C-alpha cells in the first residue's frame, strides 16, 4: 500500500473516493465538502437531508459523483460527539473508512484528517492513528481458506493542514510500522498448534534476527536443564514437541537503557493432567500471545531503532498430558532456588515465566516487562477488552498506563494487596502455583511472579488474557488475535530517555 500525505483541496483529489468526517455538533458541511457539494449540484446536502445524516457515531453517507467530480464517490462518516473524541476514535474511523471502501471495491482513496483536528492532538498524531486504523481494520487471516479475500489498497492519501505535512509524513511511517508489526503478531497467534511449535517459534525469532541484524540465542532441552530452569522444564515434559528458550537482542550503538521483555510462549495449553474442559481448551493456540507480541515488538524496533538495548525472552513450551507430565503435589525448584508446590498443572504459564524472570533479572536490566495470557480471573475482573497491570514500580506502571490511553490498548492497574500474599503460601514448599482462595486470582498470579524478580529491578506484569484474542471482533480487531500490546510497548521503548 502506497501512503501519501497531502494538503491540497479535496476537489482536486485524483482518487476513487474522498472520505471526510462530521461530528454531531457540526451544523453545516465543512468548507471543503461545501466546494464538492457545489460541483455535485447539491447532491451531498440533498442525500444528507434524505438519509438524516447527523454525524452520529459510525453513520455513513455515500454520495456517488456520476462523473461530475474527479472522484467516483464522496463519503461522509459520523464521528459522534466531539467531547468523546480521542486518538482511538480516529483509529475506529480509519477502520470504518476501509470497511466502506472494501464494500465499494475502491482501492485508491483519500481520508481527510483535517476535520479531526478538533481533537487535542497534533494532526501528525491524528494522521498516524488514521493509518493504524486502516491497516489494523483491513487485516484478515485467510491463509487456510480456499477462497481468499482479494481486496488490496493500492493508494491511501491522508489530507492534513500544510504546516503539519512534514511531521505527518514521519508519524505515518511510524504508524504503518506499528500496525504492520501488530498484524505480524496476529498472524503468528492465529496459527494453530500443529503449525507453531516451540521450535517453530524459535525459527521465527531467528528469521527476525537475520532480517534486522539482531543477536539471538536458542537453548534446547539439555541447555535449559543446565541453566536450572526446572519450573519451565516441568511444564514442557508432557509434550512430544520439545521446549525452546529464546533470547533475542537488539543492541544499538549507544543505548540509553536496557529493557527486558518477556512473553508467555505456550504454543498450546491443554491444561496438562488437570486437563481443561473442551470449551476452555478451544482457542488455546492463543496462549502464545505474549511471546508473539515480543516478536512483533522486535519487528517494529528493527525498523524504528530506539536508543535502548532490548532483550526479548520467551520460554516456549507446550502443556500436554502424558506419562512424563508433571503432577499436582509435585515440588519443583526454580532457577533462583525458590521451591514451588504444584496445586494445578493448568497454572503452567507462571512456571515458565518464573524461570524467564530469573533469567532476565540476571541480565541486570533497567526494567522488566512481561506480557502473558495468564489468568481467567483477570478477564472476570476487567472484561474481555482490558489488560491488568501490576508490578513493583508505580512510576513504570504509570508510564505504561499513560501510553496505553493513547494507543487504545486498554489497561487498568491491579493492586498488590499484602493480604493476598497469604494465599500463595504452600504447606511443603516456598510458594504455591495457585492461590488458596477463589478470589483475586489475577493478583495472586502476579504476586507469585514477584518472587522470581530481583527486587532492585523495576518490573511490570501485564495480564493480557482478555484482550489478546477475541471470538467476535470489535472495532479494528477482526475475530481472532489482536496483537495486543505491540503498539503500547514499542511506543514505550521509543519514548525512553
UniProtKB/Swiss-Prot annotation:
Domain of life from the UniProt record: Bacteria
Keyword entries, A-Z: Aminopeptidase, Cytoplasm, Hydrolase, Manganese, Metal-binding, Protease
GO cellular component: cytoplasm
Binding positions for Mn(2+) 1 per the UniProt entry: 269, 346, 348
Role this protein plays: Presumably involved in the processing and regular turnover of intracellular proteins. Catalyzes the removal of unsubstituted N-terminal amino acids from various peptides.
NCBIfam families assigned: PRK00913.1-2, PRK00913.1-4, PRK00913.3-3, PRK00913.3-5
Protein's name according to its UniProt entry: Probable cytosol aminopeptidase
Organism: Persephonella marina (strain DSM 14350 / EX-H1)
